[in-house]
Design a protein with these regions (language model features):
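Short loop/turn motifs at secondary-structure junctions and domain boundaries
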Residues: 36-40
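Helix-loop element at the rim of GNAT/NAT acetyltransferase active sites that forms part
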Residues: 18-32
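C-terminal "cap" of GNAT-fold acetyltransferases
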Residues: 119-120, 139-153
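Conserved beta-strand in the GNAT
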Residues: 47, 53-70, 77-84
Length: 153
């Protein structure tokens, strides 16, 4: 059974980092020095466990109004990022559950809009969850991305 938790200890944050390293660095070839960034220190980190094994991760960072083109009238923006699911649990709904947990946390924090930069191969996944792509394609760590946003509620 899979459980998603808001990381509440350094060990759980390290578990999130380990999942991200497996997916982004090992599998996708993102340089390790680009995978961890300055946003990690202020983020809410989420970890999905299959028993005791960490199998998914994601984070939420609160950004200023108007972040990456979001409507400034909606206030601060929840920046969903570093969503990663290990290969053995892909296709099980875990990615959807992680996004929903992060969105719920954003709503708890009083945020009305969530933005993310999606790898272009994942655009359909986020569109099915109500996100809308905008702006041109751009490179992030050697992978094509587009910005997406969703108003909560």
């Amino acid at each position: 059974m899979t459980a998603i938790r808001l990381a509440g200890s350094p060990e759980e944050v390290a578990a999130a980092y380990a999942v991200r390293a497996d997916v982004f660095v090992t599998e996708q070839g993102v340089p390790p020095e680009l995978e961890l960034d300055e946003l990690d220190s202020t983020a809410d980190h989420f970890v999905a466990y299959d028993g005791e094994l960490p199998v998914g991760a994601g984070r939420l960072v609160v950004e200023d109004p108007g972040f990456e083109g979001a409507d400034p009238a909606l206030g601060e923006v929840g920046h969903l990022g570093r969503l990663a699911v290990r290969p053995q649990v892909r296709g099980t709904g875990l990615g959807v559950a992680l996004v929903q947990a992060i969105e719920a946390r954003a709503a708890e924090r009083g945020l009305r809009v969530v933005a993310l930069s999606a790898q272009t191969q994942a655009l359909g996944f986020y569109q099915r969850l109500g996100y809308t792509a905008y702006g041109p394609e751009f490179d992030d760590a050697g992978l094509p991305h587009r910005w997406m946003t969703r108003v909560l509620g």
